[in-house]
């Protein structure tokens, strides 16, 4: 067994919380192992004045960590699963997916209790095309502005009065101790979450069998099956930050149910469908749902966007 592990992590408070959480679990499981963190800046962290959809490319928050993995500078990388591309670089693998926290989006406001109580023309901040499209579908009167930066920065912009409300991932707020800022967990029939939202992903080198074996205990099989379905759907659609796609899968015993949306940028068209089947076939079901939705009009929506 390896007696020294180096975890690669982004430098944001949320990323450090997540990586320290994994480090603590590893130390508890392997008391004789020394676990340290190596902070790495990613492209997504450096470019904060441009909407994610306009930066383009995949792996905005993962590529530099993956380079460090491949070059042997770190033994594993901790990511928010929603940030991970569906296709990984050759030589790397998704070793474990942790038990999912709340996968939903959180409505945060100092004035209003829910999206439904926002006044006409209210200003709402979010960095996600997925959220924007779904929110505009329900509330086309809202003025949605781009919101970048870490969680603290986004909350500060709200508190400074720059907007009436913001939308953030519920899991991130909870992990950083901001549960009291959540006014509402947005229902999935209003806004489906991003692929993998709420789960942490552990990535390492494929040939590092020793480290992979040490990380097995971190994997939560129900979460892994559900997110495999979501990632298979996304991979088939070939969508990233540039496409408004929401998908959420839930395992119940040996079954999995998947719900997904493909939307136009302005929310004027939202295609929604579901599928259910055996959890062992989760990835295949995700692809099946993706193909079905492409044939039902999703392909036309994507053609307009791309």
Where are these regions (language model features)?
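A conserved helix-loop-strand patch within extracytoplasmic ligand-binding domains
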Residues: 81-82, 90-142
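Structured loop/turn residues at beta-strand edges in well-structured enzyme cores
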Residues: 72, 120, 161
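Short, structured active-site "lid" loops
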Residues: 50-75
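Extracytoplasmic loops/domains of multi-pass membrane proteins
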Residues: 68, 84-89
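Short, Asp-centered acidic motifs that coordinate Mg2+ and/or phosphate
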Residues: 74-78, 164-165
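Small-molecule-sensing regulatory modules
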Residues: 2-48, 54, 62, 137-306
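Short glycine-rich anion-binding loops that position phosphate/pyrophosphate groups of nucleotides
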Residues: 81-84, 171-173
């Amino acid at each position: 067994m390896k007696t020294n592990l180096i975890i690669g992590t982004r430098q944001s408070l949320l990323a450090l919380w997540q990586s320290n959480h994994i480090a603590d679990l590893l130390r508890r499981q392997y008391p004789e192992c020394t676990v340290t963190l190596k902070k790495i800046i990613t492209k997504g962290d450096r470019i904060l004045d441009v909407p994610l959809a306009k930066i383009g490319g995949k792996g905005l928050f993962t590529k530099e960590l993956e380079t460090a993995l491949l070059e042997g500078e770190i033994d594993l990388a901790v990511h928010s699963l929603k940030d991970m591309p569906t296709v990984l670089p050759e030589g790397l693998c998704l070793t474990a997916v942790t038990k999912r926290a709340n996968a939903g989006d959180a409505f945060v406001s100092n004035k209003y209790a829910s999206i439904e109580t926002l006044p006409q023309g209210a200003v709402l901040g979010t960095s996600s095309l997925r959220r924007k499209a779904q929110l505009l579908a329900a509330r086309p009167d809202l003025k949605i502005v781009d919101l970048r930066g870490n969680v603290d920065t986004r909350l500060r912009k709200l508190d400074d009065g720059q907007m009436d409300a913001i939308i953030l991932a519920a899991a991130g707020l909870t992990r950083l101790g901001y549960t009291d800022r959540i006014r509402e967990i947005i229902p999935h029939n209003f806004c489906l979450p991003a692929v993998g939202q709420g789960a942490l992903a552990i990535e390492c080198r494929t040939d590092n069998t020793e480290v992979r074996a040490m990380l097995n205990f971190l994997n939560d099989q129900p979460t892994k099956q559900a997110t495999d379905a979501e990632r298979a759907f996304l991979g088939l659609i070939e969508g990233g930050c540039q496409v408004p796609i929401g998908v959420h899968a839930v395992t119940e015993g040996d079954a999995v149910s998947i719900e997904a949306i493909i939307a136009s940028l302005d929310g004027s068209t939202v295609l929604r469908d579901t599928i259910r089947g055996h959890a062992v076939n989760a990835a295949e079901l995700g692809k099946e749902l993706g193909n079905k939705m492409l044939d039902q009009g999703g392909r036309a929506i994507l053609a307009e966007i791309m």
